[in-house]
Swiss-Prot record:
A UniProt-annotated Pfam family: RGS
UniProtKB keywords: Lipoprotein, Palmitate, Phosphoprotein, Signal transduction inhibitor
UniProt keyword Ubl conjugation present: no
TM annotation in the entry: none
Biological source species: Oryctolagus cuniculus (Rabbit)
Keyword flag Manganese: no
Protein name in UniProt: Regulator of G-protein signaling 4
Amino acid sequence: MCKGLAGLPASCLRSAKDMKHRLGFLLQKSDSCEHNSSHSKKDKVVVCQRVSQEEVKKWAESLENLINHECGLAAFKAFLKSEYSEENIDFWISCEEYKKIKSPSKLSPKAKKIYNEFISVQATKEVNLDSCTREETSRNMLEPTITCFDEAQKKIFNLMEKDSYRRFLKSRFYLDLANPSNCGSEKQKGAKSSVDCASLLPQCA
């Protein structure tokens, strides 16, 4: 017959209490981890969770409008990544970041990093530049200034504008945002003022 807890030795009771304490701690830790994980996922999509339909339509007016909007840039980058050709937009972004450098001492190392990654013969993400622009940019590396990539950046922008930007506007990456009602959601059919960018375009996160 079961004698209950009173019949158990003191050492067994202590072990049982220890086990209960450990299990309680692990369960509490698990709940905490799940909460933090859920919170992190929400944080990731808050950047471009909603974008107005008016703004999405502006993306079709010019490449400049598209890539100067945070979610627009993310959508375009995701599209280029799907085509394995994201080096152009990566170069453009790097040039924009480079032009924001305030300290003159940081210009040279950053310029060399961009040059080695996108322009040199052995570049890991070589962009498609004509020989004249490539040579001019190479000369600029002797004494890097804040404008040393301007010509190369302009050429790559024009290249994207004439080619990949036009394909992007015909792709699902843009069309699902421009016409959310096509996704089959009845709620979205009535919501003309804005669209849930995070649900239609996970790559924005």
